[in-house]
Amino acid sequence: GHDPVDGLWSYWPAKESIADLLALREAHPYTFLSQYMQAPNKLDGGIFTEGGFLYFGDEDGGADLPLPRKWEYRFITADTAQKTNTWNDWTVFAEWGVFEGRIYRLNYQRARMEAPQLRRDFTSFVNACWEKNSGLAGNLRAVLVEDKVSGTGLIQEVQGKLPLRITPVPRERDKLTRALDAQGHQAAGKVVLPLDDPQNFEFVAEVASFTADDSHRFDDQTDVMIDAIDYAIIKPATAADKTKVTW
């Protein structure tokens, strides 16, 4: 714990070894920069706002909204990384519940993983969400996976092991355009996070740090949120507009 690693060392090795600190930097970069380096990332990428999120749970404990009694339906968005190097994006699976025009983030998994683990974890994640199907939990309606190299491979390899078909999400538009489409909905409190979830800090920090010039470090969590907004809020509204009768 006292020996430097890659030229770095801990000021308090008896309390926190350099190995522990490097592990924290890897797993929770925003937390590490804020608490240990006294150099928090600027949470203002100019697109999404930290204050745009609402929180659900115990209202007496500070939540903005209660846990809905019944979900209208649920769905999953997934963003897969092609490599597990520390400088590459993460793989993220997110389950969402829909209620009165808002999306609530439910189960959530974020990790760097090789292909075999990706297949196992994704299959387990989807099946666990499917098994909750009931009147109050609502039905799992869709599984959306980004249609790129790693995502396409995942779709082909696990489709037969899942209880419903995967919906590939093509990347027909650039990331900034998709972010700008979702921006107003996030700012309007349409994305609701579970109160006291320890994963919230990294999630909010990453989304709020998303930049127009692609200078942000990661955007895998932002991607799954954008896909969720597009699927459950933007597309239904667009479809409703198209069915309106004009005179």
For every predicted segment, state its role.
Residues A94-V145:
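Nucleic-acid-processing active sites and adjacent nucleic-acid-binding tracks
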Residues A81-K83, V98-G101, R110-A111, S150, ...:
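Short, glycine-/Ser/Thr-/acidic-enriched flexible segments
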Residues S34-A39, T84-W87, A94, E131-G138, ...:
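C-terminal nuclease/phosphodiesterase catalytic domains that cleave nucleic-acid phosphodiester bonds
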Residues L67-V98, V224:
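Gly/Thr-rich phosphate-binding beta-strand-loop-beta motif of the actin/hexokinase/Hsp70
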Residues P4, S10, L106-Q109, E114-P116, ...:
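Conserved inter-motif catalytic segment of the P-loop NTP-binding fold
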Residues A78, V145-K148:
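Short His-Asn-centered micro-motif
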Residues H2-T80:
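ATPase catalytic-site recognition across NTP-hydrolyzing enzymes
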Residues A63-R69, K83-W87, S124-A128, S134-L136:
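Short, conserved, surface-exposed binding loops centered on an aromatic residue
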